[in-house]
Design a protein with these regions (language model features):
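Catalytic-center loop of serine/cysteine hydrolases
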Residues: 24-30, 34-174, 179-181
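Structural marker of alpha-solenoid helical repeat scaffolds
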Residues: 194, 233, 267, 301, ...
Length: 395
């Protein structure tokens, strides 16, 4: 269990440099990820939050991440409650200015002794070597040999910007009130500006964009702007086109989504996940015949793609090919999908085929998943179907 590293505070109890809190959390997170590579090691990061501003007075109504003001003593560390199965606690202090300084304190919690006390001190431009050294020292203290994993970029300043972005992403994931969410993308954009091939920075920007877009129109506008900025920096970032398509679908604009997906496929024609999204955009435009071909193309790449199976089923049903549609929906059910919408589709399909008892069964399951009670017209419809077929009718 790795806790955010301590940073120095001024006489008023505030960090001497607010960025140091970001780097303390980020370096701890990075170290945990590097230590989780060997087969027998698995590190987890503890998240610390507290009431108060995240960044100045603008965030006073929200919650902010905190880091400790000093490294814990051995006695304090041994009294920290750890999750079951966790044997070691890693803590210390960190500083990232024109140099990297990390003090690592590795505590064997069951034995209540210090397994490692090591200081890493290197110039800022040797950040990657400093983190590799820290991970190696911890692994050796645990009797393991660390793997040498490549870094996602060799540009230190791009990586430092990326760390700031990771910290903001973590804040959004934990529900921390972040001032000016639109600016949460700036660190990732800086990382890509410094290293246009920094793929992980692009991926995390897009993940954050989709997360914010799902929260409402304001988030969608910020996400759309960030994706467009990424495309301006890296015109071949086809996944940014696909993220923009998702935003258009969320905003109920399938025609614009189709255009975005077409642009992505012009850059990367063989990207199979785009086939299903193209089918979905056509489906929402009620262009069912065209959608069938795209869903079938998606399933040639992955036969058990649940989204493609459900989409193909809907398109086929709208084209009057109900038996084939039922086959797709059943395959989606077998693949593990158990949504109310899928059971509702199965109920409608069974009803069209005259299988009324099966239709009632799936409608009941759909209602149970949605938490919808049986009353009024539902009871009347079921009673009428039962009377129409007789008490012994099965199909």
């Amino acid at each position: 269990m790795i806790f955010p590293f301590a940073v120095r505070l001024d006489g008023g109890g505030r960090m001497l440099d607010g960025a140091q809190g970001v780097y303390a959390r980020s370096l701890a997170r990075t170290l945990a990820e590097r230590l989780s590579r060997p087969p027998r090691l698995q590190a987890r990061v503890a998240q610390l939050t507290a009431d108060g501003p995240l960044d100045g007075d603008d965030g006073a109504e929200g919650h902010g991440f905190i880091v400790a003001s000093k490294a814990w003593t051995l006695e304090e560390a041994c009294h920290v409650d750890l999750p079951e199965g966790t044997e070691y606690l890693l803590h210390g202090s960190a500083e990232l200015t024109d140099r990297v300084r990390i003090r690592i304190l590795l505590v064997d919690s069951p034995q209540k002794h210090l397994a490692l006390d090591h200081v890493v001190l290197r110039p800022r431009q040797e950040l990657f070597a400093a983190l590799d050294e820290a991970a190696a020292e911890v692994a050796h203290a645990l009797g393991e040999e660390p793997r040498r994993e490549p870094w996602p970029t060799r540009d230190v300043e791009a990586y430092v910007a990326y760390l700031r972005g990771r910290d903001l992403s973590a804040a959004h994931e934990m529900g921390v009130a972040v001032p000016e969410p639109r600016r949460s993308f700036d660190p990732y954009l800086e990382a890509v500006r410094r290293d246009p091939d920094f793929a992980d920075a692009q991926e995390r920007l897009l993940a954050l964009a989709l997360s914010l877009a799902a929260r409402g129109h304001a988030g969608a506008e910020a996400a759309r702007s960030a994706c467009c900025s990424l495309l301006a920096l890296q015109p071949r970032a086809f996944k940014a086109c696909l993220a923009l398509a998702e935003i258009e679908l969320l905003e109920r604009n399938p025609r614009a989504a189709e255009e975005r997906i077409s642009r992505a496929l012009a850059i990367e024609p063989g990207w199979a996940p785009a086939f299903e999204r193209m089918g979905t955009s056509l489906l929402r435009q009620r262009r069912f015949g065209e959608a069938v071909g795209w869903f079938e193309r998606a399933l040639r790449g992955r036969k058990d793609d649940p989204a493609a199976l459900q989409g193909l089923g809907t398109a086929l049903a709208e084209c009057g090919r109900v038996e084939e549609a039922m086959g797709c929906w059943r395959a989606a059910l077998v693949s593990g999908v158990a949504t109310a919408d899928l059971h509702e589709n199965l109920a409608r399909g069974h009803l069209l085929l005259g299988h009324r008892s099966d239709a009632r069964r799936h409608r009941t399951i759909s209602r149970r998943i949605r938490g919808t009670p049986r009353f009024g017209l539902d009871l009347l419809r079921n009673a009428w179907q039962w009377l129409s077929n007789g008490p012994g009718a099965g199909r």
